Amino acid sequence: MSGAPDNKESLKQWIKDNFLFEIDIEPSGTGNVELKIKEKGKQSHNLIDVGFGYSQFLPLIVKIWKTIYVDMPNDAAIDGDNKRKKEHFILMEQPELHLHPKLQEKLGRVLAQTVRFCNDKKYDVRFLVETHSEAIINAIGSEIAVNGLNPDSVNILLFNAKSEGMDKYVEKAYYSKDGYLMNWPIGFMS
């Protein structure tokens, strides 16, 4: 991301709109800067003084924003032959760690909305998310049911432990057009 003010303001607004907190960068007086987090209705705090989840979460959501609003438009997503020029993969390992369930749910919604946005723009952006978060999984299903995300845009692979007597190591689950999980193991979330 360039240091251009419009990019900074765009990022700040996107975070505020999608995650209901604000970020700000302030000089600290020692030649350094402080990254401030302000949750809705609360006082702003230095990143080091808020929950550990923010320090893990911010790089992830900045990467998503940068990919769809800076990288993809600059890559000219489609050439004259209607072929995708550049693929972007964003990998996430347990993004729910240290996050409040409300932020997990918002992340799930943003992932689903980003997939729909990229499909509409013909951007080749793919996410690989390893998660155990019921909030993320349910938010994606809700986006399918309520906001029209194509369920074929989401693949779910379940990795089973053969040592626990499971027949298959990898099984595929999926969402119905109504956002319901299909072929989901009974008791997985309980």
Please give the residue ranges for each predicted region.
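Switch/communication elements of ASCE P-loop NTPase nucleotide-binding domains
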Residues: G3-K8, Q13-W14, F21-W184, M189
